[in-house]
């Protein structure tokens, strides 16, 4: 199975600008990518990392500055044909992902396997149907369910918090420190981020 990991390497994670500088956002993006690559390789697969700009990574990086929709739809068209082929796509900002969660994503035999994000996005999918295409705008998990059914594909979903947790906002950083011991968590700790508890709520504060 072909497995792609698209990543924005040019101006990544702009919604973290209130807590991270541009260089730090890039470094943190590389750390999250390292966690995803490690999980995929541990599950016995070779990830194809595709970035909008060069990035440091343990595996080769293909630079492609197209948007996410045209990139992934081109991968679908070139990989999934009437006779054979399967494509998995896993987003690069899933630092909680593990070998086991990747195996859960790849295990079902449905034409389309979807991993919803907590905010209504689609954090990962597997496609074996030649007519399925993606549109990541808005509540994409809802749209991808409908698209799969419209083309006559069988659909299943993987209920995994580790696949569902993408890191976009400052509040999301607590999830990394709470539930991961990988490269992204290490980077946050080395950068001075620590968990705090205020009024019964766990948050993150930077102390240096």
Curated annotation (Swiss-Prot):
Its signal peptide is none
Annotated pathway: Cofactor biosynthesis; coenzyme F420 biosynthesis
GO terms for MF: GTP binding; phospholactate guanylyltransferase activity
Task: Tell me the Gene3D superfamilies matching this sequence.
Answer: 6.10.140.50, Spore Coat Polysaccharide Biosynthesis Protein SpsA, Chain A
Q: What does this protein do?
A: Guanylyltransferase that catalyzes the activation of (2S)-2-phospholactate (2-PL) as (2S)-lactyl-2-diphospho-5'-guanosine, via the condensation of 2-PL with GTP. It is involved in the biosynthesis of coenzyme F420, a hydride carrier cofactor.
**Reaction catalysed by this chain?**
(2S)-2-phospholactate + GTP + H(+) = (2S)-lactyl-2-diphospho-5'-guanosine + diphosphate
Which UniProt keywords are given for this protein, alphabetically ordered? GTP-binding, Nucleotide-binding, Nucleotidyltransferase, Transferase
Q: What is its EC number?
A: 2.7.7.68
Q: What is this protein called?
A: 2-phospho-L-lactate guanylyltransferase
PANTHER family, sorted: 2-PHOSPHO-L-LACTATE GUANYLYLTRANSFERASE
Q: Which family does it belong to?
A: Belongs to the CofC family.
Gene this chain is encoded by: cofC
Which Pfam family is one of this chain's hits? CofC
Assembly and interaction partners: Homodimer.
Q: Does the keyword Acetylation apply?
A: no
One biological process term from GO is: F420-0 metabolic process
Matching entries from NCBIfam families are given as: F420_cofC
């Amino acid at each position: 199975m072909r497995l792609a990991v698209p990543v924005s390497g040019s101006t990544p994670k702009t919604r973290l600008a209130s807590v991270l500088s541009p260089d730090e956002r890039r470094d943190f993006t590389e750390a999250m990518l390292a966690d995803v690559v490690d999980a995929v390789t541990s599950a016995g697969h070779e990830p194809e990392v595709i970035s909008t700009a060069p990035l440091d990574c343990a595996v080769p990086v293909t630079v492609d500055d197209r948007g996410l929709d045209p990139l992934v739809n081109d991968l679908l068209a070139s990989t999934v044909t009437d006779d054979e082929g399967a494509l998995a796509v896993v987003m690069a900002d899933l630092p909680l992902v593990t070998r086991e969660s990747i195996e859960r994503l790849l295990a079902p035999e449905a034409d389309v396997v979807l991993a919803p994000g907590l905010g209504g996005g689609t954090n990962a999918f597997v496609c074996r149907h030649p007519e399925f295409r993606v549109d990541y705008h808005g509540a994409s998990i809802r749209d991808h369910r409908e698209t799969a059914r419209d083309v006559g594909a069988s659909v299943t979903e993987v209920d995994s918090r580790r696949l569902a947790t993408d890191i976009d906002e400052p509040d999301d950083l607590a999830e990394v420190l709470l539930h991961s011991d990988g490269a992204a968590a290490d980077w946050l700790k080395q950068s001075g981020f620590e968990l705090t508890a205020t009024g019964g709520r766990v948050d993150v504060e930077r102390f240096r």
